[in-house]
């Protein structure tokens, strides 16, 4: 029984497929059958998308033309034909000048045509509302300002490390952090540097009035190095310039002369007392020298750097003084040493006047107690 269409319909249906499956069923369909179908579907989708875009474009209602637009519609075509090399912006400038040059009588027909188009537009679209394609400039500026503020704010996940590197926790990077020089860091990074340097000073115990005198002797010897001159200027009390320079020069002379004095007489109690006295006095910038040693430093108070002859003479005088102090009675030397700081500073201590050196209170303890008491009253002056 033959088909009613004579087999044309079956041939049309099998055009997308090859005839090999009919003759050789084991080979299956041809490889180019599915790509052809997929290409056809893609074309259909593109056609549908273009139809939708056209529908949207047609759905958009255009505004009615004004008189200038009605006149420029034909005039722009004429100018474009006469000047094919000119840009559209140049054509618009020429059209604007030509429109302004027209008289009211010449503009009247275009104005009437624009009014007719406006009335027709109102009749065709009674509920028309103008919707501009471009947003207003004010909204754009506001959005730019808010975006700028968000960019200016630091991210919450940004953490500044102690070594001055910025780590972003939100980004999962497969490589390690790279170190950058401090010059490339942002401005805000240097505010964290004091916190990074603070742990270096945790090991030092700063002397306070509540600490005992023995803590000064047991402290780290590295802390009692030669102090900078800024500490002497930042002390709460102040003397005249000559007295301060006298103390600083005396401190430098004592530091240079102490090793020589130790080499000449080892094991002397006088040298031991002077060695114990030098450490806290050098730190606080106050020199408690005996009257004889202070007398030799007075002529050098006004000089910034004494000549080498004066240093040699002072060194020889100091060696002679050490020899003389070794021959002085021990109790007499302790008596002058314990009260020399009070007499020089001009302060009266009622609580320390009655202290008498005994077997327990040796020269070291008396020197340390006098030094700690003087430092306490100098750092905390009475109102």
Swiss-Prot record:
Pfam families: HMG_box, Sox17_18_mid. PROSITE patterns: HMG_BOX_2, SOX_C. Keywords: Activator, Developmental protein, DNA-binding, Gastrulation, Nucleus, Transcription, Transcription regulation, Wnt signaling pathway. Signal peptide: none annotated. Gene3D superfamilies: High mobility group box domain. One of its GO terms (molecular function) is beta-catenin binding. Residues 1-20, 37-58 are annotated as: Disordered. It comes from Xenopus tropicalis (Western clawed frog). This is Transcription factor Sox-17-alpha. Residues 267-382 form the Sox C-terminal domain. The gene is sox17a.
